[in-house]
Amino acid sequence: QQYTSTVITRYFNYCINERKHPDHGIIGGYLFYDRIIKNYLAAYLSVLQETHYPVSLSDFYFHGRHFSEKQLPVFSYISDCILAHNIWKQSEETRKLYEYYNLSTALGETYKILTICDNPLLYILAIADTLEPIKAYEKINPKTVSESINIEYMPGSRKLTFSSSNNAVDISELHRRAKGLEGWTSAHCTEITGGAFTLCL
């Protein structure tokens, strides 16, 4: 677990009070866990209605799908990653506010840098959310963005190379975001060379 429930609650309050909107990542994380547990219980109740023998809540099948209590920690882990990937590391501008809301684990000197080895899913969510081209170029037509940005991956290399195939989309904006990852993840970004840059994961 990247953050305690107390820190998550404090950050949520910080977002509502200071950023003037609830954090969608925190809401999404809690909703994911809530819905998937309800789905688990609904499947179990349906099995009870359809069968005439005892069924264990900890391990059962419903419509060919296996439900097991061993899946619950996985659900919890996924939920935690969704929650945590949207909790931002403190910047110089937000330091006093973070201290006010007692967000000690998100302060610069105590923040735990995200790595792919320590927490693969959280790391991938952080990278994908930061470098999502449609979000990065929200003022440009999504179709134009999708047709302009090229992302190359060499299997086994942990490297992504980004480039733009035309002048409609300036690759420097995506590069700026990629460089920003260096402050809170273990990712390393090269400079732009020949209209392309590489992100080392």
Residue ranges and their predicted role:
Residues 128-131, 135-201:
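C-terminal effector/catalytic modules and regulatory tails appended to multi-domain proteins
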Residues 1-152:
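Divalent metal-dependent catalytic cores for phosphoryl transfer on phosphate-bearing substrates
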